Amino acid sequence: MGERQAVKVAILGTGNIGTDLMYKLLRNPGHMELAMFAGIDPQSEGIARAKKLGIPTSYEGIKAVLDDPEIRIVFDATSAKAHVRHAKMLREAGKIAIDLTPAARGPYVVPPVNLGAHLDKDNVNLITCGGQATIPLVFAVSRVVPVRYAEIVSTVASKSAGPGTRQNIDEFTFTTAHGLEAIGGAEQGKAIIILNPAEPPIIMRNTVYVIPANEEFDQAAIVASVDQMVAEVQQYVPGYRLKDAPVFDRRRTPWGERTIIAMLLEVEGAGDFLPPYSGNLDIMTAAAWRVGELFAQHLLGIRQEVAA
């Protein structure tokens, strides 16, 4: 067997998301080699953990990443405000940015929906945890019948929402709603996030409501499309599951009496670093890993079949 081909990658941001992504890369590096784990807090628990694991670390933030010309892919797990600044510097340095913040300097990507169309970009955005969880389901409906309206409610454990999540609440609602439209295929989207302080903490729960643009659709085809999409997401997020089959219900809406499709979704984390109830964070790091792996394969010239 030949030597494993790998692209050098870096993680920028040493909080919960950055640290969980670090463990995912160590558990399953694929075609990636973690060459730098950088933040700005010398007392960061994440940096301490990385040092013990023998990973190169720095608390000089993006400077440390820019100083290594061999790093090709950078996962930015900082904040929306920070990424606006980082995006320009990474682009000028010729590095690919995978943005885990709601900054959205590059196109939105959801791995099983549209990643293949953006493998030539130098910056892609993973939207939000709610977007990664729910956009696949809206897209699964919209590829069968046009969607007039999609609304999602993401409920996450308060304990799983760190300062970055709390600071980005407004960006979450706007970015997720736009993702429901731009990628999910809905004419109009709306997103709501709820932080639930219950003890013991609950796993991530999402309610997805979809109103088709017309009544001329095959319910069985929609159910089959949704089931296929769930199976695709489960390839990189094993804890992603529907609570039950989609429910079709006639209700009054602003567009008259219509069929509303309701789907209840849970996301349980893999427990790489964060507790299993943090499915909202896990789906972001799992999606980031998947996007990074496919970018690495693309850079290495490895053929792949990816949704476009």
From Swiss-Prot:
NAD(+) binds at residues 14-17, 160-168, 280. It is an enzyme of class 1 (oxidoreductase). It catalyses: acetaldehyde + NAD(+) + CoA = acetyl-CoA + NADH + H(+). Keywords: Aromatic hydrocarbons catabolism, NAD, Oxidoreductase. Its EC number is 1.2.1.10. The keyword NAD applies. One of its GO terms (molecular function) is NAD binding. It holds the Pfam family AcetDehyd-dimer. The keyword Oxidoreductase applies. One of its GO terms (biological process) is catabolic process. The active site is at 129 (acyl-thioester intermediate). CDD domains: ALDH_C. SUPFAM superfamilies: Glyceraldehyde-3-phosphate dehydrogenase-like, C-terminal domain, NAD(P)-binding Rossmann-fold domains. Belongs to the acetaldehyde dehydrogenase family. This is Acetaldehyde dehydrogenase. It comes from Thermomicrobium roseum (strain ATCC 27502 / DSM 5159 / P-2).
